[in-house]
């Protein structure tokens, strides 16, 4: 049974001649890690913003647990590419910030924040200031903050796009560990093909102008990592390489088609 449902979603900016998104149908079920991948102009971020409730669709319906999404809500935790952390708060204060706004007593919210810091391998970092953290550590704090409110769904907007290659791989592996431990459904958007293939239990390929779904792939590479197989072994598996090359060819053909129409 799906927790999150998108039915015939369309989106168009005022004054634009072409919709950003057209006829998008998606569902996110329990323990699923759904990744949306596509070139620039395919509407990835617009799609996440619709699910988060930051903007309303031009057409169609979005429901979470059968309830229409009509704005932002604590049941949807969001992790952004830019860490969006509060520089005047320490790490613990950042993770606990949403709980503070919700009126959770201090002792309870700090205990929850420390629990989430342990989950993302930042034990002992609670008193550090944001400027003392590396890029990867900031993203761990952002992930811990999103999880602290115990959302029904975790939304991730190209969360590792600004990180160096080594840190990006570390964060991908951490996300799979957190996903396995918490059983939270995740909707993640990315432009990184290898990342998408490695993480996704379902991979949705988007084409641009207007953004639309052109292919869906059911994958298990992330589940294999979560079950204990090494990332290196998975990424050298011929099945992984074949899938990555197939997705690369599809994305390349979309970009080429877009250039020919320009």
UniProtKB/Swiss-Prot annotation:
Recorded GO CC terms: plasma membrane
Chief subcellular location: membrane
Subcellular locations according to the entry: Cell inner membrane
InterPro entries per record: AAA+_ATPase, ABC_transporter-like_ATP-bd, ABC_transporter-like_CS, ABC_transporter_ATP-bind, P-loop_NTPase
Occurrences of domain ABC transporter (ranges): 4-233
EC number(s) given by UniProt: 7.6.2.7
Protein's membrane topology: Peripheral membrane protein
Catalysed reaction, written as an equation: taurine(out) + ATP + H2O = taurine(in) + ADP + phosphate + H(+)
Binding-site positions, ATP: 38-45
Keywords (A to Z) from UniProt: ATP-binding, Cell inner membrane, Cell membrane, Membrane, Nucleotide-binding, Translocase, Transport
UniProt-recorded Gene Ontology molecular function terms: ABC-type taurine transporter transporter activity; ATP binding; ATP hydrolysis activity
Taxonomic superkingdom: Bacteria
Annotated PANTHER family: TAURINE IMPORT ATP-BINDING PROTEIN TAUB, TAURINE IMPORT ATP-BINDING PROTEIN-RELATED
Subunit structure, as described in the record: The complex is composed of two ATP-binding proteins (TauB), two transmembrane proteins (TauC) and a solute-binding protein (TauA).
Function as written in the Swiss-Prot or TrEMBL entry: Part of the ABC transporter complex TauABC involved in taurine import. Responsible for energy coupling to the transport system.
Family: Belongs to the ABC transporter superfamily. Taurine importer (TC 3.A.1.17.1) family.
Protein name in UniProt: Taurine import ATP-binding protein TauB
Gene: tauB
